[in-house]
């Protein structure tokens, strides 16, 4: 609306994740004996103004979501042997945008001994969840369009 570029924010933890992601991708490729195709923004096939940025595409059916958290968070993931729930929506929407059938969640911490650095868990596509989420995204975008139209009307007064 303003035409101005928004401010960006980064901290040491975010920078660590950015710096470490290529190492995590390489470790995953070695473990799974695959090549990961890096992609940028992938628009949703039917919802205009929606899309996702997965960390990579794997084969014909998969994608990759990499997290390089702090050591305590990575250890919790190792101990639970499960994907933190807060990432499910992100991965499901990535599958909706890419048409992929599964997402390998990766947690990686190269500050730990080699055998503890990498955690991989496959998450299958959930079409029922995706449908509900897509309905909510469409609803949100429609509400946003209404608000923008109201602001434009005020601007033209």
Where are these regions (language model features)?
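Accessory terminal regions of nucleic-acid processing enzymes
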Residues: 1-157
């Amino acid at each position: 609306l303003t035409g101005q570029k928004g401010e960006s924010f980064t901290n040491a933890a975010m920078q660590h994740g950015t710096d470490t992601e290529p190492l995590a991708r390489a470790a995953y490729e070695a473990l799974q004996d695959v090549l990961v195709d890096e992609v940028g923004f992938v628009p949703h096939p039917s919802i205009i103004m929606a899309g996702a940025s997965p960390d990579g595409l794997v084969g014909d059916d998969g994608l990759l979501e990499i997290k390089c958290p702090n050591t305590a968070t990575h250890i919790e993931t190792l101990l639970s042997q499960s994907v933190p729930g807060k990432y499910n929506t992100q991965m499901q929407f990535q599958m909706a945008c890419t048409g992929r059938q599964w997402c390998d969640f990766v947690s990686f911490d190269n500050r730990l001994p080699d055998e503890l650095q990498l955690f991989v868990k496959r998450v299958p596509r959930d079409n029922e969840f995706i449908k509900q989420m897509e309905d909510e995204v469409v609803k949100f975008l429609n509400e946003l369009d209404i608000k923008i139209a109201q602001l434009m009307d005020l601007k033209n007064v």
